[in-house]
């Protein structure tokens, strides 16, 4: 087994390999001064692309640093020597692999073939040269420039061929003519030359004509530049007319295409709408058939609950027909409520305030009743405004009414509490029935009725419970027996307020009658 190369040998080899122009840039991204290498492909990479290769795995690309790593083997160095960026670029381009994605590029068939090729060439070079520093493809003498040889290989595959400076140099073209001139000048000294006597004059003419034909394009170009300056050509009016006609034709064609597309879209939309309407008609017919099979009550319930389309068919319309306005009828409940409000307003018409002297009581189209109806609104307002000014002593504002009501309630509660204290002063325990007098009153009434009926031979339920007293008129009914004390006070207060309102209404009616008919 061959010994490992020393660090000096590794640096010498990579210094010479990095001096090649194609190896001065990254193989993947083209970054300058790459310091990493892929032994699997024999190419030089930058640090970013080396990370990408390392993520691919060692089975696809084995990465090492050309400056930091010192444990290179001779097989790895031979792979780098037989490889190179230029050879890899040419091989991938030859096999049609031009992908930029690293995963796609290095998992392709071309990459697999190139890996195998580099491995075979490196093994062959190691077997042949052993531990020699250079191989046959590289010059062992440092005086010879290896860059020139590698640059020729690079220009052959990646760049356009360079021009021959010797062919384009005018001094070079004139140098060979000098010996011919000198030889022609030296011919008289040697004697007359008869070699040209056998030449045909037509050949010389043909030669001159070919030379003139070659120079004619240059002369024409010079004349064109002298006349037109920048080589512009005059455009005739006919060309403008032709261009304008073509533009008009293109515009018409574009408009026609747009109209056709719009028409086609409308037709498709109408067709889809017609199809949807037909489907709705079919569904409605199915629902009608289902409802016809039902009995009378079930059918009415289905129509009322909206379980079919029959009840909605009266207000449905076709999407292809014109829209029709559907007016909603006024419901009967609104009329009834309005009539109740009008009846309430009619009551307020009697409370008309001061008359309007601008109005004529005998104007056309007005009657006595309609006149009062028209004045109902402001008459009610006047009632509300004049209500505090009524002279009747029983009418009070709302605040005073509530205060008086509260006073009555407090008085009644105070009386009840004092009576309860006196009544149950010596009792040890009382119940709610005893406190409110329910139990005592019922027992007392029952005992009194039994005493009254003790001497009678026969009694009835009406006599026992006292139901017929009010019917025969034998007993007297008072508000005290019907309503409690607090309710009696409220009832009296309500009667007083109603009486006051009636007085106001009567006063308003009398004032309006006097104002209207008093002068007649």
Curated annotation (Swiss-Prot):
Phosphoserine sites (modified residues): 140, 145, 200, 236, 239, 311, 333, 339, 363, 431-432, 512
Record GO biological process: protein transport; vesicle-mediated transport
GO molecular function: GTPase activator activity; zinc ion binding
Keyword Iron appears in the UniProt entry: no
Any one cellular-component term (Gene Ontology): plasma membrane
Taxonomic superkingdom: Eukaryota
Bias (Polar residues) ranges: 168-200
Assembly behavior: Interacts with the coatomer complex. Interacts with the C-terminal appendage domain of COPG1.
Name this protein carries in UniProt: ADP-ribosylation factor GTPase-activating protein 2
Organism whose genome encodes this protein: Mus musculus (Mouse)
Name of the gene encoding the protein in the UniProt record: Arfgap2
């Amino acid at each position: 087994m061959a010994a490992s190369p020393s660090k000096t040998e590794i640096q010498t080899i990579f210094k010479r390999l990095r001096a090649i122009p194609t190896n001065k840039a990254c193989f993947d991204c083209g970054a300058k001064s790459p310091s990493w290498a892929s032994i699997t492909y024999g190419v030089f990479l930058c640090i970013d692309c080396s990370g990408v290769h390392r993520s691919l795995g060692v089975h696809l690309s084995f990465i090492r640093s050309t400056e930091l790593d010192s444990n290179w083997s001779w097989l790895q160095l031979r792979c780098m020597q037989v490889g190179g960026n230029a050879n890899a670029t040419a091989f991938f381009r030859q096999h049609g692999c031009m992908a930029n994605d690293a995963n796609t590029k290095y998992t392709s068939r071309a990459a697999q073939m190139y890996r195998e090729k580099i491995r075979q060439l490196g093994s062959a070079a190691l077997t042949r040269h052993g531990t020699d520093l250079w191989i046959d493809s590289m010059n062992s003498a440092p005086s010879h420039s290896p860059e020139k040889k590698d640059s020729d290989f690079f220009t052959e595959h990646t760049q356009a061929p360079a021009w021959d400076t010797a062919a384009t140099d005018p001094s070079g073209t004139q140098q060979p003519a000098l010996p011919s001139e000198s030889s022609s000048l030296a011919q008289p000294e040697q004697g007359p030359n008869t070699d040209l006597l056998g030449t045909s004059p037509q050949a010389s003419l043909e030669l001159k004509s070919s030379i003139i034909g070659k120079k004619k394009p240059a002369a024409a170009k010079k004349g064109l530049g002298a006349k037109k300056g920048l080589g512009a050509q005059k455009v005739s009016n006919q060309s403008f007319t032709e261009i304008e006609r073509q533009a008009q034709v293109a515009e018409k064609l574009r408009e026609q295409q747009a109209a056709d597309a719009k028409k086609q879209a409308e037709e498709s939309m109408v067709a889809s709408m017609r199809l949807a309407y037909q489907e709705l008609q079919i569904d409605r017919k199915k629902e009608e058939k289902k409802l016809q099979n039902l009995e009378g009550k079930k059918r009415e319930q289905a129509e009322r609950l909206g379980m079919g389309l029959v009840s909605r068919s009266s207000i449905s319309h076709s999407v292809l027909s014109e829209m029709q306005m559907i007016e909603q009828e006024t419901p009967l409940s609104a009329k009834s409520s309005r009539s109740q409000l009008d009846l309430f307003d009619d009551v307020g018409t009697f409370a008309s305030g001061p008359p309007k002297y601008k109005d004529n009581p005998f104007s056309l189209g007005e009657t006595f009743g309609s006149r009062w109806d028209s004045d109902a609104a402001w008459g009610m307002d006047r009632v509300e405004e004049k209500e505090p000014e009524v002279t009747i002593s029983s009418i009070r504002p709302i605040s005073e009414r509530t205060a008086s009501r509260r006073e009555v309630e407090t008085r009644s509660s105070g009386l009840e509490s004092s009576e309860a204290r006196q009544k149950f002063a010596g009792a040890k325990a009382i119940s709610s029935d005893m406190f409110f007098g329910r139990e005592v009153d019922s027992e007392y009434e029952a005992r009194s009725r039994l005493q009254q009926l003790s001497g009678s031979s026969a009694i009835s339920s009406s006599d026992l419970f006292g139901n017929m007293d009010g019917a025969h008129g034998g007993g007297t009914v008072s508000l005290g027996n019907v309503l409690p004390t607090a309710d009696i006070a409220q009832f009296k207060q309500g009667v007083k307020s109603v009486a006051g309102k009636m007085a106001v209404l009567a006063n308003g009616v009398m004032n309006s009658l006097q104002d209207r008919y008093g002068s007649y």
